[in-house]
Regions:
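Phosphate/pyrophosphate-binding loop motifs in nucleotide- or prenyl diphosphate-using proteins
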Residues: 1-120
Length: 120
């Protein structure tokens, strides 16, 4: 598969998201164990998607309604950590918040690549 293939581009961006979440998790205070566990769970889900995308398969990945709901609920649990979050502001509150902002923008890029590609 050529490097210009949308699937290869998507794999690279998801790898960026996983890495940035890992960096954010590394800078998250040990007292925030629930947040650290949630970040690890999200990394694990993204790694499962990566394993699928790395396969040379015509089979399509489907995230069931339960998986989507679980991910949305996980995102909702982050809201107390980002009280007053403004996506148009410069992320400077702390390292963890800045790294999560990088992960968020990379995830949005992955979403756009997926929407453009014939992967659905």
């Amino acid at each position: 598969m050529p490097k210009t293939n949308s699937q290869i581009e998507l794999i690279g961006v998801i790898e960026e998201v996983i890495s940035n979440i890992g960096a954010a998790r590394a800078f998250t205070a040990s007292s925030e164990e629930e947040l650290r566990k949630e970040l690890l769970r999200i990394q694990t889900q993204l790694a499962q998607i990566l394993r699928y995308l790395h396969k040379d398969s015509t089979e399509r990945i489907t995230l069931g309604e339960d998986a989507v709901t679980e991910l949305e609920n996980g995102i909702d649990r982050f809201e107390p950590y980002y009280d007053g979050f403004d996506p148009y502001a410069i992320a400077t509150r702390c390292r963890t918040a800045a790294l999560m902002e990088v992960a968020r923008t990379s995830a949005r890029r992955a979403e756009r690549i997926y929407a453009r590609a014939d992967l659905a």
